Each structure stands twice: as structure tokens, then as C-alpha cells.
Amino acid sequence: LYTDMTAEEAIAAGTATPETADGEETAVPETVEVQSKKNDTVHTYLKDNTTPIYWDYPLEDADFGNADYRVFLAGETRGQPQNTAMRKALFQYLHEQQGVNVQLVETGVGETQVLEQYLRTGDENWLNHYLKLQGSCADAEAEYWRWLYQYNRQQGGTIYVAGLGTERNTVVSMYGLLALADTEIEPAESIADFVQALRDEDMMTALQLFKTAMEEQPDAMADYFGDAYAQVQQLYANLQVNTTY
């Protein structure tokens, strides 16, 4: 959209009003004016808080304005080949210079556990489960997460994953539940069928039995999952919301 423009010119173009966009004043319906005022607030914020980063030069603290920030959110245009290089450079800089140890992802609890398991083990089966969510971006995602796995090993395993989204694929979420389960512990008889389905990777059956077990056998589920039970509860809540939606 803003080809051949500098970052400053692109921001200015984004904040153009109907009067300034083409040099002529245009009548604007009232509903459009209301929406325009909302957009002006967004554009003003972006204009006041945007710092262009040029990838021909190394990143430095000044690129981020305030070195005390603890959360960094980056946008991207999906499908662009430079995205992966940007993500690598950004995370490596933030980890080494700003102490960032957590990679945020747009996934729910279960799907995030699949990624976390890959990051801990390097087992490609876990990565492949996650890639089912990525569609046409699967190749770029695979490249990034394989890089992050190797980088995390070099950093002593100090990097973790946290999900901020919803459960998009219930089968993948069930694999996340499998990652939370302790395969060495024998479950109570009341939830044995659920655990067996999970271990057999019969995920559609496990999904139905999981919902029943959480409703009817919460104590047995808490005993089986132990310290991970809070995450299991959040996964169950996420699935309920998704089903309702």
C-alpha cells in the first residue's frame, strides 16, 4: 500500500483526512465522521509512538524508546518473506539486551503446550502438531521455531512460550493436554478411560471424555495432573467458550 514511501511518509498518508487526501474537500456522511474521529485517535497514537527500524543497521536501545518495557508486541504482514528474519533478529536482541525470556503466541493453553513441548525436546512430532494451525504460513513458522529451539539450547533453556489466544483446533489442544499429563502416574479408575484415550492419541474420544471428567470427576483430575491442574482448568474453560461461540 505504501510502496516507495519512507516510514514517515507512510504514517502521514495513514493520517490523511478527506480534505487533505486529494487536495479537495469532500462531503462526509455523519457516520463516517464519527468513525474518522476514532481512526484519528489511533493514527495520532501511531504517529506519536512509531519508531522506524531499518534492518540494514543493528538494533539498539533507542529503537524501543523506553528500555524499562517488559512486554514487546510486534505486528507483521502475513506471508512476507522478511517476517522470519525480523522475528529472529527482534527476539534475539530482546533476549540478550532486554532480558526477555518469554515468546508470546496467539494460541490457547493446549496449543501453547504443544509448542512448549517442542521447545523443551526438539521432537518434530510436537512441531508438526502445531503447524496444523498455520495453513499457508506453515513453512515460515517451522523455520522460526526450529531456529528458536536451537537458539534456546545455546541460551541454556531459559526461553519459554506463553499463549494469549483461544483454542483454534481441539485435536491440537488435546495434544497439549497430553504434554501436561504425567505418563508415569496411574489415574483413578473413574478417569481411566479418558487417560487411556489420551495416551492412545485417540483425541476425539479423549476430548469428549475430558469434558465429562472435568464436570464429574474434578478431584480425580486434580490428583492426576497435579501442579499442572490449573492449566488443565484453563484449557477446559477455553474449550467451553469456543464451543459456545
Locations of regions flagged by a protein language model:
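Structured catalytic-domain cores with a bias toward divalent-metal coordination
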Residues: 2-6, 14, 19, 23-25, ...
